[in-house]
């Protein structure tokens, strides 16, 4: 798959759309939670975080008083800024995640090209980058310091399930286990992330021993060993995705 055809496959000289694994997992969006985060960001845009103590209203009062001194056009802009604060936050987080993936991918490619896939640790290309150090800190307890990187940012597809995806990292441990790793620029790995890695496991002919989610702002990586259960759950999710998609 070429980059411009990331979720497509060439059949009879025609590009056919595949189903993106991340798109399947997105149907599990918790809308009540999303609404909470959206309204929280709006209030933060007005100087108040609901997570703060109830008496911590000075910033809110100051911001409201400031807005009241503006003309109607400026007031509208200020309120729109608060209204769209969550969208801007999400966009900034996505950009940050992309930057982290680029750093880790460059480092992983260097490991493959210059060190037979073994981890480059300190004093070498990008190895001293905070994101690389954080990855090593969280991942090594689960895969070992002698693990070997097989592939990074691996674009793959399953013609049987009509799926496509990009796997962050695939490694082989010293005792021969094949592991899928996924990075997230946040403090925790959620169940949705495990399901996403379960989807990736369909893209490779070699059996996957376990998956490992690595939260680059967290304290612990999250492994999952029952890959067959993840695959079973993901297939159910894929069925639901196809059902819902027919109404679009």
Residue map of PLM features:
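Nucleic-acid nuclease catalytic cores
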Residues: 130-131, 154-248
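Metal-dependent nuclease catalytic cores that hydrolyze phosphodiester bonds in DNA/RNA
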Residues: 1-163
């Amino acid at each position: 798959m070429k980059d411009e055809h990331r979720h497509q496959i060439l059949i009879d000289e025609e590009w056919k759309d595949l189903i993106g694994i991340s798109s399947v997992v997105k149907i599990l969006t918790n809308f009540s939670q999303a609404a909470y985060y959206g309204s929280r960001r709006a209030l933060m845009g007005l100087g108040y975080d609901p997570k703060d103590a109830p008496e911590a209203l000075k910033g809110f009062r100051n911001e409201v008083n400031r807005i009241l001194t503006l003309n109607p056009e400026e007031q509208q802009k200020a309120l729109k800024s608060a209204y769209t604060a969550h969208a801007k936050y999400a966009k900034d987080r996505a950009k940050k995640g992309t930057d982290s993936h680029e750093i880790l991918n460059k480092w992983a490619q260097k490991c493959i090209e210059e060190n037979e896939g073994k981890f480059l640790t300190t004093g070498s290309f990008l190895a001293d980058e905070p994101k690389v150090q954080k990855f090593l800190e969280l991942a090594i307890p689960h895969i070992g310091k002698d693990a070997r990187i097989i592939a990074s940012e691996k674009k793959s597809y399953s013609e049987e399930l009509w799926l496509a995806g990009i796997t962050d990292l695939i490694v082989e441990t010293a005792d021969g286990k094949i592991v899928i790793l996924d990075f997230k620029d946040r403090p925790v790995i959620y169940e949705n992330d495990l399901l996403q890695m379960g989807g990736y496991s369909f893209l490779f002919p070699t059996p996957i021993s376990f998956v490992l989610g690595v939260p680059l702002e967290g304290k612990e990586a999250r492994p999952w060993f029952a890959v067959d259960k993840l695959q079973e759950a993901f297939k159910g999710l894929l069925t639901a995705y196809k059902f819902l998609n027919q109404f679009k």
